[in-house]
UniProtKB/Swiss-Prot annotation:
This is Large-conductance mechanosensitive channel. It comes from Anaeromyxobacter dehalogenans (strain 2CP-1 / ATCC BAA-258). It is found in: Cell inner membrane. Keywords: Cell inner membrane, Cell membrane, Ion channel, Ion transport, Membrane, Transmembrane, Transmembrane helix, Transport. It is a multi-pass membrane protein. The keyword Signal does not apply. Channel that opens in response to stretch forces in the membrane lipid bilayer. May participate in the regulation of osmotic pressure changes within the cell. One of its GO terms (molecular function) is mechanosensitive monoatomic ion channel activity. The chain crosses the membrane at residues 9-29, 86-106.
Amino acid sequence: MSFASEFKAFALKGNVVDLAVGVIIGAAFGKIVDSIVNDLVMPVVGAIFGGFDFKDYFVALKEIPPGVPHALDAVKKAGVPVFAYGSFLTIVLNFLILAFIIFLMVKQFNRMKRAEPAPAPAAPPEQVVLLREIRDALRR
């Protein structure tokens, strides 16, 4: 078998295609979760903790030059090293929301799998039934 045909057989297996579809859908779903966190959750958290965007919380590790606004992007542009804990907390919140949603999806999927009753066993062929009757008759 040639290298190209081996690769084609590998790449077109159902598992590889399913994995590719899952990665693509996961990336799109990640963008939805990012939007939920950045556009819906974090503004509320920011309003509770001081009125500005939570992802702009940082600690400058050097003195901020005079005239530079105290915003994360401006401080980074000025070359000041920062400890951007607000961005980190936003990403952690993204992860927790995504993990919770995936947990709910898996839980629902497992519930649906359990809800389906097991199929009744198929009746044995007539030959098997006849052989069992003969066996039982010989035992007597």
